[in-house]
Amino acid sequence: MSHQLPDIQASRPDVTVGLSQVGVTDVDKLVKIERDGETPLVLMAEFEVFVDLPSGRKGIDMSRNMQVIDETLEAAVSGSVSRVEDMCGDVAERLLEKHEYTTTATVEMTADLVMHEDTPASELPTQNTISILASATATDEGTREEIGAEVIGMTVCPCSQGMSASRARDVMHDLDIEDETIETFLEQVPQPGHSQRGHATLTVTADGSPDVDLIELADIARDAMSARIYNLAKRPDEDYMTYHAHADAKFVEDCVRSMAEQVVNSFEHLDDDAVVRMKQSNDESIHQHNAHAEREVTLEQLRAEVSAS
């Protein structure tokens, strides 16, 4: 074309309202995570990338912006990556540099990570999938990064279990079994309760890069539920999972509080201004609704609450 096309995106909008996030979603990239002395992990990661838009600008130059985003992501993922949250931070900072009209750049990444483990009783090799959650927000004041995981486990309802134990106690009383024997039996043989598949999410956000291990976060979230679950389960494994879940029945509230306690105990080195996000959602087995509990809190406040328990 012989003439310059108008830059519509740079024009003034009819309604001068600023937008907090404008960008692209569902951007798939291969990410290779280097590990000292071990085979690198290769992830198919999905990115969401946003910048803010001032009130006097109509748009973000979507096509050109996508090229910038793609080049920036490609440069980040093609290099040596040891922490995905640092990679997100690098992308966010580069985007902030390349957009003179923006004050905030946000990058979010999700990916599935497959881990090798053994079943709890039969000790057979199997695989476990955890969802990696990483993000970063860059501003002129600095960059905050988030890392965490979403995992699946099993919970048992304490209320339902309590009713079953009460019924068992009444039956044994009617059979003239001594109280001490009844209580010993109930202690050693947890009574049935309705179960749920639990979805636990645990993330930590801090200035720069949170000094936490992704796998440790996943383990804390898994162990906060009544029991871990496994893709492969022979009969001894099914018995193990069922027994241990019923021996540690928990509400969704209990799961979040278990995460809170373990985070405080495990990450004493983190600064007080780190933010912890804990979430538990359970798929109910006997209800048409599901159960949910969550908390987002600074580590300073969480430490104070846990120490007061």
Swiss-Prot record:
Q: Which GO terms describe its molecular function?
A: GTP cyclohydrolase I activity; GTP cyclohydrolase IV activity; iron ion binding
Site location (May be catalytically important): 157
Q: In which pathway does it act?
A: Cofactor biosynthesis; 5,6,7,8-tetrahydromethanopterin biosynthesis
Q: Name one GO biological process term.
A: tetrahydromethanopterin biosynthetic process
Q: Which InterPro entries match?
A: GTP_cyclohydrolase_FolE2/MptA, GTP_cyclohydrolase_MptA
* Cofactor field: Fe(2+)
PANTHER family with a match to the protein in the record: GTP CYCLOHYDROLASE MPTA (PTHR36445:SF1)
Provide the assembly information. Homodimer.
Write down what this protein is called: GTP cyclohydrolase MptA
